[in-house]
Regions:
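Conserved SAM-binding loop of SAM-dependent methyltransferases across substrates and taxa
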Residues: 140-151
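A short glycine-rich, Lys/Arg-flanked "PGG" loop and its adjoining helix->strand segment in the class I
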Residues: 213-228
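Short alpha-helix
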Residues: 257-273
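Short, glycine-/aromatic-enriched active-site segment of Class I SAM-dependent methyltransferases
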Residues: 235-256
């Protein structure tokens, strides 16, 4: 067995205390090896730099936290020099893509205003009170904190990008809540037919999958009977037989495979075994929701759209539209 990466030891200890379900306990035995491979400095050459940034976070105590505000917030007293140290350490984890966050007055203005998406979906989903929740492709965990703020008993986010895991750890360092986790895993690394979660979220993942039906069935297998799937993905206009396959890039992304119409997406979900399928929202992404900032200085949505017509991508395809669909496991 490989050694557990130091930043993930507390997660395993928390699972050991809480998990009684047989399938989860079996998964727990696999985690040290999974985490060691996912957080390998041999595979990810920037990991030492990111870990140094995490280690440089100053010691501060939050007197108030807010998981329900637009920005996940921790407040408390801090000297000016300490705040400079805090900001320097956090900027060492650039680029910050999903948020926003506010730590002791240091505002992390992320590329995405992820609160916009939460505001669109939260009124339409099953209440999260006392639920075990999975967030697939969670990034740095912004929505995981919102799920906890909505009353979830336990939230597990998974994302294979080590930087996002360490960004989450930076926020967790000050929020100090041990029932929210971001693990360095892809959905395919979870045990098959886990059937352990009351609600599973998959947002911004499906269009990156070469086999969308396989992704939907993998999501289905994470859910306990009666559990709810909350799915968000790129869509195009059309009927239930409309699916757009970008010939090359889409909005400068080379890893976009299938963009269904909402009706086609719901047809796929029925094929994958879901019931009670509801279209919650369709929204064209705006440059107010996704843009470059001081905390994410690379290209963003304004660079991916036709400068003369924001209804088209630079390649001439329909501009990004995102649908939110809920469904249930019988």
């Amino acid at each position: 067995m490989l050694d557990t990466p130091p930043e993930l030891i507390a997660d395993i200890e928390a699972f050991q205390r809480r998990w009684e379900d047989r399938a989860l306990r079996d998964w727990l035995q696999q985690m040290p090896d999974q985490f060691s491979l996912s957080m390998s400095e041999t595979r990810f050459g920037d990991l030492p730099r990111w870990r140094a940034a995490l280690a440089a976070l100053p010691s501060l105590k939050a007197e108030m936290i807010d998981l329900d505000a637009s920005a996940i917030t921790a407040l408390g007293p801090a000297a000016e020099q300490v705040l400079l140290e805090l900001e320097t350490a956090l900027r060492g984890l650039h680029p910050w893509r999903k948020g926003p966050f506010s730590l002791f007055g240091v505002d992390i203005d992320t590329e995405w205003r992820s609160d916009f998406k939460w505001d669109r979906l939260s009124p339409a989903i099953d209440p999260l009170e006392d639920r075990r929740v999975l967030d697939v492709g969670c990034g740095s965990g912004y929505h995981c904190w919102r799920m906890k703020g909505a009353g979830a008993r336990e939230v597990i986010g998974i994302d294979p990008t080590p930087l996002f895991v360490l960004q989450f750890k930076a926020i967790q360092h000050y929020l100090n809540i041990d029932s929210v986790h971001v693990l360095p895993l892809a959905l395919e690394q979870l045990p098959p037919k886990l059937k352990a979660f009351d609600t599973t979220f998959s947002m911004g993942v499906l269009y990156h999958r070469r086999s969308p039906i396989d992704h939907l069935t993998d999501l289905r297998d994470t859910l306990a009977p009666g559990g709810q799937l909350v799915l968000e993905t790129l869509v195009v206009e059309g009927d239930e037989d409309t699916v757009f396959v970008p010939p090359e890039r889409y909005a400068r992304m080379g890893n976009v495979w299938f963009l269904p119409s909402p009706a086609a997406l719901m047809k796929w979900m029925r094929k994958a075994g879901f019931t009670d399928i509801q279209l919650v929202d369709v929204n064209q992404t705006t440059v107010a929701e996704q843009r470059s900032t001081d905390w994410m200085t690379f290209y963003s949505l304004p660079n991916f759209l036709d400068s003369a017509d924001h209804n088209k991508t630079v390649e001439g395809h329909p501009a990004p539209r995102r649908a939110i669909v809920t469904a249930r496991l019988p």
